[in-house]
Amino acid sequence: MRARNLMRLASVASVCSLIAACGSSAPADISAPTASVGAIPLLARASTRRLLDWPEFGLNPQRTDVSESATDITGANVAHLRRVQLKLAGTVDSSPIYLHDALVGGAAHNVIVLTTTYGKTLAIDADSSRTLWTFTPSGYQNWAGSAQITTVSPLADPDRRFVYAASPDGLIHKLSLAGGSEDSAGAWPVSITRDATHEKLGSALNIDGSDLIATTSGYFGDAPTYQGHVVLISRSSGKLQGVFNTLCANRRTIMVPSSCAQSDSAILSRGGAVVEPGGGRLLIDTGNAHWNGATDFGDSVLELAVPGLTLRQAFTPTDQETLNASDLDLGSSAPALLGEDRIVLAGKDGIMRVLALSRLSGRPPSSRETLGGEVQRLPAPGGGELFTAPAVWRRDGRTTMFVADENATAAYVMRRGRLYLAWENHTAGTSPVMAGGLLYVYEPSAGGIYVYHPGSPSPIAKLPGAPGHWNSPIVVDGHVVEPEGNANDHSLSGTLEIFSAG
């Protein structure tokens, strides 16, 4: 996860030549077979159901970022939404969440909840744009304005009474939705690192049954020592239910980072841990670090069993050493669940890898981890580095995936376990979302949200906005909500865009 290497390989082709030289058993070609846009299902109209809540990054624990339910925003009115810009007491370099008709301050509100890079969590009325409450973590003044930040998206408890949020001191907080007060019962708030100055809380929180899932990474520049790890936290008590360290994996507690001989292996993706359908298993992937297939898992995809967070199987590409040496983190984007026993991931090398979920390494799960085994490799959109989360739409037995990166936005369809490129344009984007039959992609360099019909690379509208970084929108209950700004600017202010129908 080191800062972008100025000597980075100039193109996907040059990376491909290095991979070919490795003599892998992986597919030899790196190409994008094509399909017509007609392969993308038609959605004549949104479901009669309305999408009222957006409780976490990716909408659900599987991080699909897709809902066919109606949002009250259509192709006919999307270019005419009412725009409100709010100045915030901090930058939100992540995504917000939303709850319809939530009880706050004794009254029902349609509530946006978001967390700034220095750990302030705010609840905002989506209709009036009024701030309902602000939670400021203890110690805020100690890191405000510094490089010690968080980019964690908050998560709403299914009971709608609490929200969970992170702060740069390594704590996960349980906050009352009614007023923003901190729940200190049991073990709350929960520390998930022994050194918050080196281990960053960067990826979105997730949930699996009674447990909250959180992960750690490193800061920009990769100052050692840190180890990416994932933790399970009881939502009720705050008790740690499990820990998996991606380095020194034989140690099952939260370590002092300097006590492990290896460093890095960040879990740095926007999506963090992805929960498989039905729960009980989750997927993570890691950034640059040492790999030995036993205790150290740099540049790998790991499937962990819940509740013990035991390693079930793993995938590591044959060119892992090259990725590590060249700062080409495999895990810059989380695994995306495609269905039909397939997942896909893409990293900073500009290559998407399709894996069989039942056999990540191409072999039955076992304690002996080996290199290689992907089903397919193809270029990321425009050959770009991928730091975003794909959106995956399954309809009528077909899978469509939307991906955006620093170079392009693209749509892929899956046939017989392989991905085919249906369309691509040259517009950069962060994590796409599809809601109510429309696709929304925030463009972080120039700002603004491009809106598409899923079957076309030509936008039907662009919502105005300012530049950002990893921010991505949500579209729910008649609103498009998009935070703006870059965490690496270390600013104490930011902007929130709210576009509303009616």
Name what the model sees in each region.
Residues 29-51:
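Post-signal peptide N-terminal segment of mature Sec-exported envelope proteins
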Residues 94-100, 112-114:
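General structural concept
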Residues 48-70:
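Predominantly extracellular/luminal regions of secreted and cell-surface proteins
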Residues 49-50, 68-91, 103-108, 119-147, ...:
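Extracytoplasmic/lumenal domain signature
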Residues 19-21:
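C-terminal motif of bacterial Sec signal peptides marking the signal peptidase cleavage site
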Residues 1-12:
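Bacterial N-terminal signal peptides that target proteins for export
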Residues 23-26:
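Bacterial signal peptide processing site
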